[in-house]
A protein has these predicted regions:
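Beta-strand secondary-structure signal
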Residues: 8-10, 63, 104-106
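Extracellular structured ligand-interaction cores
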Residues: 6, 59-61, 100-102
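N-terminal, Lys/Arg- and Ser/Thr-rich interaction peptides
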Residues: 2-23
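Short, surface-exposed loop/turn motifs at beta-strand boundaries within globular domains
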Residues: 2-4, 35, 57, 98
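Internal, well-folded beta-alpha domain core
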Residues: 2, 67-209
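Charge-rich, low-complexity amphipathic helices
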Residues: 14, 31, 63-65, 139-144
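Glycine/small-residue-rich interface belts in oligomeric ring/scaffold proteins
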Residues: 20-84
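Intrinsically disordered, low-complexity boundary segments flanking structured domains
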Residues: 1, 47-53, 92-94
Protein backbone atom coordinates (compact mmCIF):
# COMPACT_ATOMS: atom_id res chain seq x y z
CA UNK A 1 0.00 0.00 0.00
CA UNK A 2 1.29 3.44 -0.97
CA UNK A 3 0.58 6.47 1.25
CA UNK A 4 -0.27 9.72 -0.52
CA UNK A 5 -1.61 13.17 0.30
CA UNK A 6 -5.02 14.02 -1.10
CA UNK A 7 -6.80 17.36 -0.87
CA UNK A 8 -10.58 17.49 -0.45
CA UNK A 9 -12.89 20.43 -1.03
CA UNK A 10 -16.56 21.03 -1.79
CA UNK A 11 -17.91 22.99 -4.72
CA UNK A 12 -21.50 24.10 -5.18
CA UNK A 13 -23.53 26.38 -7.38
CA UNK A 14 -27.06 27.40 -8.23
CA UNK A 15 -26.54 26.22 -11.79
CA UNK A 16 -23.92 24.38 -13.85
CA UNK A 17 -23.53 23.51 -17.51
CA UNK A 18 -20.80 21.10 -18.61
CA UNK A 19 -21.64 21.28 -22.28
CA UNK A 20 -21.44 18.27 -24.56
CA UNK A 21 -19.47 19.50 -27.56
CA UNK A 22 -21.35 17.39 -30.11
CA UNK A 23 -24.89 18.62 -29.33
CA UNK A 24 -25.22 21.84 -31.35
CA UNK A 25 -27.68 23.60 -31.53
CA UNK A 26 -29.35 21.76 -28.63
CA UNK A 27 -26.72 22.23 -25.92
CA UNK A 28 -26.93 19.26 -23.55
CA UNK A 29 -24.87 18.98 -20.38
CA UNK A 30 -22.94 16.16 -18.79
CA UNK A 31 -24.67 15.03 -15.60
CA UNK A 32 -21.78 15.83 -13.26
CA UNK A 33 -18.59 17.84 -13.09
CA UNK A 34 -15.87 15.85 -14.87
CA UNK A 35 -12.09 15.71 -14.32
CA UNK A 36 -11.31 18.19 -17.11
CA UNK A 37 -13.67 20.76 -15.55
CA UNK A 38 -12.16 20.14 -12.09
CA UNK A 39 -8.68 20.87 -13.45
CA UNK A 40 -10.09 24.10 -14.87
CA UNK A 41 -11.44 25.02 -11.43
CA UNK A 42 -8.02 24.42 -9.90
CA UNK A 43 -6.44 26.54 -12.61
CA UNK A 44 -8.82 29.41 -11.81
CA UNK A 45 -8.05 29.26 -8.10
CA UNK A 46 -4.29 29.26 -8.66
CA UNK A 47 -4.27 31.73 -11.54
CA UNK A 48 -2.91 29.36 -14.18
CA UNK A 49 -3.45 30.97 -17.58
CA UNK A 50 -5.19 29.17 -20.41
CA UNK A 51 -1.98 28.50 -22.36
CA UNK A 52 -0.32 26.74 -19.41
CA UNK A 53 -3.37 25.00 -17.95
CA UNK A 54 -2.91 21.68 -19.74
CA UNK A 55 0.76 21.20 -18.84
CA UNK A 56 0.36 22.29 -15.22
CA UNK A 57 -2.76 20.24 -14.45
CA UNK A 58 -2.57 17.16 -16.71
CA UNK A 59 -1.12 14.93 -13.96
CA UNK A 60 -3.75 15.80 -11.34
CA UNK A 61 -5.84 12.78 -10.38
CA UNK A 62 -9.49 13.56 -9.68
CA UNK A 63 -12.40 11.83 -7.99
CA UNK A 64 -15.84 13.35 -7.45
CA UNK A 65 -18.67 12.63 -5.05
CA UNK A 66 -22.02 13.88 -6.35
CA UNK A 67 -23.73 15.13 -3.19
CA UNK A 68 -26.99 16.59 -4.50
CA UNK A 69 -29.38 14.62 -6.65
CA UNK A 70 -29.39 15.38 -10.38
CA UNK A 71 -31.83 18.17 -11.30
CA UNK A 72 -31.97 19.43 -14.87
CA UNK A 73 -33.63 22.46 -16.46
CA UNK A 74 -34.06 23.23 -20.15
CA UNK A 75 -34.33 26.80 -21.43
CA UNK A 76 -34.95 28.08 -24.94
CA UNK A 77 -32.97 30.93 -26.45
CA UNK A 78 -33.03 32.74 -29.78
CA UNK A 79 -29.44 32.89 -30.99
CA UNK A 80 -28.14 35.28 -33.63
CA UNK A 81 -25.77 34.16 -36.38
CA UNK A 82 -23.30 37.03 -36.88
CA UNK A 83 -21.09 35.32 -39.48
CA UNK A 84 -22.72 37.04 -42.42
CA UNK A 85 -22.04 40.76 -42.78
CA UNK A 86 -25.19 41.54 -44.75
CA UNK A 87 -27.73 39.20 -43.18
CA UNK A 88 -28.57 38.37 -39.59
CA UNK A 89 -30.15 35.00 -38.89
CA UNK A 90 -31.98 34.07 -35.71
CA UNK A 91 -32.41 30.44 -34.75
CA UNK A 92 -33.83 28.75 -31.63
CA UNK A 93 -31.60 26.76 -29.30
CA UNK A 94 -32.47 24.65 -26.28
CA UNK A 95 -29.87 24.82 -23.51
CA UNK A 96 -29.76 22.28 -20.69
CA UNK A 97 -28.61 23.20 -17.18
CA UNK A 98 -27.93 21.37 -13.93
CA UNK A 99 -29.62 23.04 -10.97
CA UNK A 100 -28.54 23.22 -7.31
CA UNK A 101 -25.31 21.26 -7.72
CA UNK A 102 -22.94 20.21 -4.97
CA UNK A 103 -19.84 18.04 -5.22
CA UNK A 104 -17.04 16.84 -2.99
CA UNK A 105 -13.78 16.88 -4.95
CA UNK A 106 -10.79 14.66 -4.14
CA UNK A 107 -7.50 15.43 -5.85
CA UNK A 108 -4.05 13.88 -5.82
CA UNK A 109 -1.19 15.99 -7.17
CA UNK A 110 2.41 16.91 -6.44
CA UNK A 111 3.07 18.36 -3.00
CA UNK A 112 3.79 21.87 -4.27
CA UNK A 113 0.43 22.16 -6.02
CA UNK A 114 -1.40 20.64 -3.05
CA UNK A 115 0.19 23.20 -0.72
CA UNK A 116 -0.65 26.15 -2.98
CA UNK A 117 -4.23 25.00 -3.43
CA UNK A 118 -4.64 24.37 0.29
CA UNK A 119 -3.40 27.88 1.11
CA UNK A 120 -5.74 29.50 -1.41
CA UNK A 121 -8.82 27.54 -0.30
CA UNK A 122 -8.18 28.09 3.42
CA UNK A 123 -7.85 31.85 2.85
CA UNK A 124 -10.78 31.93 0.43
CA UNK A 125 -8.57 33.56 -2.19
CA UNK A 126 -8.82 32.90 -5.93
CA UNK A 127 -6.98 34.54 -8.83
CA UNK A 128 -9.66 34.00 -11.49
CA UNK A 129 -13.36 33.54 -10.82
CA UNK A 130 -14.09 29.78 -10.71
CA UNK A 131 -17.21 28.70 -12.55
CA UNK A 132 -19.15 25.54 -13.30
CA UNK A 133 -18.82 25.02 -17.03
CA UNK A 134 -19.99 28.50 -18.09
CA UNK A 135 -18.85 31.89 -16.83
CA UNK A 136 -22.32 32.86 -15.61
CA UNK A 137 -22.44 29.85 -13.25
CA UNK A 138 -20.15 30.93 -10.41
CA UNK A 139 -18.68 28.17 -8.22
CA UNK A 140 -18.58 28.47 -4.44
CA UNK A 141 -15.66 26.55 -2.92
CA UNK A 142 -15.27 25.18 0.60
CA UNK A 143 -12.02 23.68 1.87
CA UNK A 144 -12.29 20.41 3.82
CA UNK A 145 -8.76 19.20 4.40
CA UNK A 146 -5.64 17.35 3.33
CA UNK A 147 -5.63 13.67 4.24
CA UNK A 148 -3.46 10.62 3.96
CA UNK A 149 -4.79 8.26 1.33
CA UNK A 150 -3.57 4.94 0.09
CA UNK A 151 -3.72 2.86 -3.05
CA UNK A 152 -5.70 -0.29 -2.34
CA UNK A 153 -5.17 -3.69 -3.93
CA UNK A 154 -7.75 -5.08 -6.32
CA UNK A 155 -10.87 -6.25 -4.53
CA UNK A 156 -14.49 -5.48 -3.73
CA UNK A 157 -15.16 -2.06 -2.19
CA UNK A 158 -18.00 0.38 -1.59
CA UNK A 159 -17.40 3.51 -3.67
CA UNK A 160 -18.87 7.03 -3.32
CA UNK A 161 -17.42 8.39 -6.58
CA UNK A 162 -18.25 7.51 -10.22
CA UNK A 163 -17.02 4.06 -11.23
CA UNK A 164 -15.65 3.16 -14.66
CA UNK A 165 -18.11 0.62 -16.08
CA UNK A 166 -15.63 -0.85 -18.56
CA UNK A 167 -13.01 -1.70 -15.92
CA UNK A 168 -15.14 -2.79 -12.97
CA UNK A 169 -17.89 -5.22 -12.08
CA UNK A 170 -20.81 -3.66 -10.21
CA UNK A 171 -22.92 -5.46 -7.61
CA UNK A 172 -26.51 -4.32 -8.20
CA UNK A 173 -28.05 -6.23 -5.28
CA UNK A 174 -29.17 -3.05 -3.48
CA UNK A 175 -32.06 -2.04 -5.72
CA UNK A 176 -33.14 0.86 -3.47
CA UNK A 177 -30.26 3.08 -4.61
CA UNK A 178 -30.81 5.21 -7.70
CA UNK A 179 -27.80 4.94 -10.00
CA UNK A 180 -26.98 7.22 -12.92
CA UNK A 181 -24.70 6.64 -15.90
CA UNK A 182 -22.94 9.06 -18.22
CA UNK A 183 -20.10 9.04 -20.72
CA UNK A 184 -17.79 11.79 -19.45
CA UNK A 185 -14.49 13.27 -20.67
CA UNK A 186 -11.54 12.51 -18.43
CA UNK A 187 -8.66 13.93 -20.48
CA UNK A 188 -8.05 16.70 -22.98
CA UNK A 189 -5.18 18.10 -25.03
CA UNK A 190 -3.38 21.44 -25.24
CA UNK A 191 -6.16 22.79 -27.47
CA UNK A 192 -8.74 21.87 -24.81
CA UNK A 193 -10.25 19.20 -27.05
CA UNK A 194 -11.50 16.13 -25.19
CA UNK A 195 -9.31 13.13 -25.99
CA UNK A 196 -10.56 10.37 -23.69
CA UNK A 197 -13.96 9.42 -22.31
CA UNK A 198 -15.19 6.91 -19.76
CA UNK A 199 -18.64 5.51 -19.21
CA UNK A 200 -19.27 5.84 -15.49
CA UNK A 201 -21.99 4.93 -13.02
CA UNK A 202 -22.58 6.78 -9.77
CA UNK A 203 -24.94 7.31 -6.85
CA UNK A 204 -25.74 10.63 -5.18
CA UNK A 205 -25.63 11.82 -1.59
CA UNK A 206 -24.03 9.45 0.88
CA UNK A 207 -25.06 6.39 -1.13
CA UNK A 208 -22.35 3.99 -2.24
CA UNK A 209 -22.01 1.57 -5.10
Amino acid sequence: LVDMKCLVFKVRGDYARFRKSYTTPSALTYLLIHPVAVRGLIGAVLGINREELYEKTKDIKVAVQVINEIKKDMQSFNLINMKSSDKIFRFPSNVEFLRDVKYRIFIKADENLINKLQSSLVKGEVVFTPYLGASEHIAKLEYEGVYNCEKLPKGQYEIISPVDLDSNTIDFDDSDILLTTDNIPIDNDKNREYTKYKKVIFATGENKI
